[in-house]
């Protein structure tokens, strides 16, 4: 077993502590950080969906991308690159988001929910691990999304430019941007604090390569536990923080922005895990890669935002009352699509 990478552990502890802090300062319960939820809220703010309770441009998303950009520039790792099956990445990003909104959270929120005592998230974790395991089977068989190409700094700057525009819109708050007055979208930490925390998390995630999928994938495939320690560190930090603030609530019932349908919690996260393995990283990792110049990750993030819009425009997203019929059908379709991509992209020479 390789040595512990203390930078990954430190990054995990900071992410967990940041999640607790942001919740204490106004973010929804067990949602200090959630890439899926925050991209959904941002999509709503831009008018891509009309669910009035989940519309807000989340500064944390802006901060993560810009923090990654700053770190990548500082260590000369910013590089415009892309062209690796962009259309497939867009579609996979869309279905990863559909799976996440079936569960009501990305892998990072799953960890934060576990740290808050939400046992439904343990069920989600089981599905997540199974999905990652299925993905690794295809990696071992030679799955590939084809090579990426050097595309230049301008192409790599697209996502940073998008989030700068989002920051301007957040601060200016023009009338065509939608902001929730009730529900999860109306609950948020102060803009400056959320932005600064996002910058720190983005920079640390870029330097440490923290990835909620990568930790489990590497442990399964290579017996390499470095990234997995970061995964565990997030949960430990959230547990400690919630115990200190009195927000630890062990159980299945009455958890914030969660439902108790175990089967669909597991299936939603299985779809997230499988799709994320094919994409090369979890939603957090995709934001970080987009910040350091990956056009492929930018396409993936845009796919996730469209996926969020589809979820709320067509009734695919779950609620505290449980999953919807439309959402169940969409997740099943997602498994079919991910399976087709997995089988078709196994290298012929493998």
What name fits each language-model region?
Residues 1-350:
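Membrane-interfacial helix-loop segments of redox and metal-homeostasis proteins
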């Amino acid at each position: 077993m390789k040595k512990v990478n203390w930078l990954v552990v430190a990054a995990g502890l900071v992410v967990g502590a940041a999640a607790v802090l942001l919740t204490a300062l106004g973010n929804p319960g067990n949602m200090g950080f959630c890439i899926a939820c925050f991209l959904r809220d941002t999509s709503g703010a831009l008018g891509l969906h009309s669910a009035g309770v989940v519309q807000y441009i989340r500064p944390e998303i802006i901060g993560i991308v810009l923090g990654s950009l700053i770190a990548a520039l500082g260590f000369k790792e910013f590089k415009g690159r892309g062209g690796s099956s962009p259309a497939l990445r867009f579609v996979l990003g869309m279905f990863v988001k559909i799976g996440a909104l079936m569960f009501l959270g990305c892998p990072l929120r799953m960890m934060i929910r576990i740290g808050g005592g939400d046992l439904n998230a343990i069920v989600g974790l089981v599905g997540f691990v199974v999905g990652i395991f299925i993905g690794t089977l295809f990696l071992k068989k030679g799955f590939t999304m084809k090579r990426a190409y050097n595309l230049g700094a301008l192409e790599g700057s697209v996502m940073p430019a998008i989030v700068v525009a989002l920051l301007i819109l957040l601060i200016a708050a023009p009338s065509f941007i939608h902001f929730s007055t009730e529900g999860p979208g109306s609950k948020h930490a102060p803009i400056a604090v959320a932005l600064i925390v996002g910058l720190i998390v983005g920079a640390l995630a870029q330097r440490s390569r923290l990835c909620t999928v990568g930790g489990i994938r590497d442990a399964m495939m290579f017996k390499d536990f470095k990234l997995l320690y970061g995964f565990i560190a997030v949960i430990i930090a959230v547990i400690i923080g919630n115990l200190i603030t009195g927000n630890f609530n062990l159980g299945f019932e009455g958890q914030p922005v969660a439902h108790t349908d175990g089967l669909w919690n597991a299936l939603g996260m299985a779809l997230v895990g499988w799709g994320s393995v094919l994409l090369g990283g979890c939603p957090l990792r995709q934001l970080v890669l987009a910040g350091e110049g990956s056009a492929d990750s930018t396409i993936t993030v845009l796919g996730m935002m469209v996926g969020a819009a589809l979820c709320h425009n067509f009734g695919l997203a779950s609620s505290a009352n449980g999953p919807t019929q439309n959402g169940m059908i969409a997740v099943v379709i997602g498994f079919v699509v991910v399976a087709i991509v997995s089988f078709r992209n196994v290298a012929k020479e493998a």
